[in-house]
Amino acid sequence: MSITKKPNDTMKAVEIVKFGGPENLKLKLRNIPKLKKGEILIKVHYAGVNRPDILQREGNYPVPKTASDIPGLEVSGIVVDREKSATKYPVGSKICALCHGGGYAEYVAVNQNHCLPIPKKLSLEEAACIPETFITVWSNVFLRGGLKKNESILIHGGASGIGTTACLLYTSPSPRDDR
C-alpha cells in the first residue's frame, strides 16, 4: 500500500478478550478510527508495551471513558491521513505519538499535538518508546526536577521501562550543557 493511499474501513487490532495473561490478547477486525478535529491517522509500525497496558490486560486498570479499549499508549509510524485542521504533519511523515489507547492496531487516530517527528538518527522501532517512557523521564527528571551535572538521583524500579530509560538518560552524555 502506498503511504498516501487511504486505508479500507477495517483494520487488525489486538483486543483483550478476557482479563488475565497475554494469552487473552486476540487479533480481531475493527473499524479504522474516524478522525476528529486536529487528529491524524497513523499507520502503526511499532507500539510500546507499558505497565498500564499490562494492568489493563489484567483487569487492574479501567479504560477511561474517552479512551479506546484497544491497549497501546505509544506508537511510531507514518501519517496516512489527517483531519483538515491538522496541518503539523503532512501525509507521509514519520512520527511517534502518545495515544489515548488504541496503539495495538494497524491504525490509530491521535491528536497532532501528541505527536513528535522522529529524529533522523532513530529508526521507527527505536522511536516507539519516546512518547511514554523517554518524555516522562526527561520532563520529570530534567525539566521539572531540574537535575543538573554532578547531582545524583535515586531510581526505584530500574528494570522497568521508565527506570531503564532514567538510568540510560542519567548516565548518557547530555546534549544540554547544564546537566
Positions of PLM-derived features:
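Basic/polar N-terminal segments that are highly enriched at the extreme N-terminus
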Residues: 1-11
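Short N-terminal binding/cap micro-motifs at the start of the first secondary-structure element
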Residues: 21-25, 51-52
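Glycine-rich beta-strand-centered segment in the early N-terminal region that forms part
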Residues: 31-48, 60-102
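NAD(P)H dinucleotide-binding glycine-rich loop of Rossmann-like/cofactor-binding domains
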Residues: 55, 94-157
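Glycine-rich NAD(P) Rossmann-fold beta1-alpha1 loop
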Residues: 160, 164
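Aromatic pocket-lining residues of Rossmann-like dinucleotide-binding sites
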Residues: 170
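Single conserved hydrophobic/aromatic residue that forms the stacking wall/gate
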Residues: 173-179
